[in-house]
């Protein structure tokens, strides 16, 4: 097979007219290879040439990057399952922070790992005295994903409760609280 492929690039005098290049690889072959790469690497390779660009749109490449229950996630986040979107488009939409549950939660896929990430605003949790202005202020800010933070003025105890009903894929997850401790500044309080 290699000899007959090489013969395509030799003219009648036995002189090589042009040599084979990466663009000559079959699209299915390229797609089979790039499916083993991380999504950012796939997107970088898509800029190489037309063959890599076309292969980067193959549904089977992106289906392997999506969580197993991505149909449920798409329905939960978008409210419908788009029938005319390719898997790459679905992956791209899920990688953006998608707001749901009355704007109190955002969910997205980690671009490199495909893991599901979620952020919950202070308004999406039950926090001790959060609605009492003697203890808390809600301050608009661009530093928060939700464009608002709960600023604690004073309190004697602090409890946070919350429940999440979400179709997370099977796996191990971590929970983090973002708190900023320090003195009150002019803008806060």
Where in the sequence are the language-model features?
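Generic preference for well-ordered secondary structure
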Residues: 17-18, 36, 46-50, 146-148, ...
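Plant-skewed but cross-kingdom recognition/interaction modules and surfaces
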Residues: 3, 32, 55, 59-189
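CRL adaptor-proximal regions
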Residues: 1-35
């Amino acid at each position: 097979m290699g000899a007959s492929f090489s013969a395509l690039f030799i003219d009648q005098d036995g002189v090589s007219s042009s040599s084979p290049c990466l663009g000559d690889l079959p699209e299915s072959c390229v797609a089979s290879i790039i499916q083993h790469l991380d999504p950012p690497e796939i997107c970088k390779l898509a800029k190489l040439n037309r063959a890599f660009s076309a292969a980067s749109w193959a549904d089977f490449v992106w289906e392997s990057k999506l969580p197993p229950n991505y149909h449920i996630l798409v329905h939960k986040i978008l409210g419908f399952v788009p029938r005319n979107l390719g898997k790459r488009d679905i992956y791209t939409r899920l990688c953006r922070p998608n707001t749901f549950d009355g704007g109190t939660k955002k969910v997205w896929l980690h671009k490199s790992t495909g893991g599901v990430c979620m952020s919950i605003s202070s308004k999406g949790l039950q926090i001790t005295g959060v609605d009492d202005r003697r203890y808390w202020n809600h301050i608009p800010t661009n530093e928060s994903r939700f464009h608002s933070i709960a600023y604690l003025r004073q309190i004697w105890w602090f409890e946070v409760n919350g429940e999440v009903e979400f179709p997370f894929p099977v796996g191990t997850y971590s929970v983090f609280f973002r708190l900023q401790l320090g003195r009150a500044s002019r803008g806060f309080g």
